[in-house]
Amino acid sequence: MAEELVQSEKLLSLDPKLQEDFQQKVHDIRRKRKANALTPGVIYIGHIPKSLIEPQLQEYFNQFGTVTRLRLSRSKKTGNSKGYAYVEYECDEVAKIVADTMNNYLFCERLLKCEFVTPEKVHPRLFIGCNTRFRKPTKPAVTRYNSKRNKEEVKKMTQRMISKEYKLRKRLAEKGIDYDFPGFAAHREMRKELTCDANTSVSSQDPTPVCTPTVLERRKSVRLEQIEDEEEDDDEVVLKLPQRDDEVVVKLPQKVSSAAKRQKISKLGKKTNIKELK
């Protein structure tokens, strides 16, 4: 009351004699305005399709009346909609009409659930941050885990994991728990053994060895020996024709491979050289 009188004293009437009456009239008018002020109303909206977000909901529910505040509930972890929201209208009568009209309304293959929330049930912190723009969480732990590491970072990470494993085994031993489990240290030793065997082995059943020129030459020589053995086994090719009077056997000359040709040419060259010397 005192504040209103102070504000009304700032206004001056044209006639100084009627100043008190003027201030009283201004005070009465302002009090009537406050008495006739609209009380806001809040409605709860459930079963909202996940494709709808704040701007679309604001545009849709503004057709019933003036929407002062809107809050769509979102997940803090993923940022996706939880499927329910709270809308505040300028007038509570409009909010009640909207709740009755939109309840069980088929919208995007879903039945909307609308309820009017009484002022006693409205939490004072319900609409805090409703006007701020939503930003999707960055997930720094996921990006840090998926990032590529150099040799030094990998070494530090393995040392840290092995130290944690050692501390865990120590705590279990202090509590009298006899429990052995394969950890990072055992896996690391096993990987070292596998790498050593792969470097030293040459067999085809072992892990793939390092491809050096000596290994490649050795494999080529083994393959040539196998081809020569197969050619020695197959000396003649016999074709049996259907028998008329006498059985006819046709012998075809053996196909000579390129490796055998090279060996024959080298032998002939040696013989000619020996004859010339004689």
Swiss-Prot record:
PROSITE patterns: RRM. One of its GO terms (cellular component) is nucleolus. It is found in: Nucleus, Nucleolus. CDD domains: RRM_NIFK_like. InterPro entries: NIFK_FHA_Ki67-binding, Nucleotide-bd_a/b_plait_sf, RBD_domain_sf, RRM_dom. Keywords: Nucleus, RNA-binding. This is MKI67 FHA domain-interacting nucleolar phosphoprotein-like. It comes from Xenopus laevis.
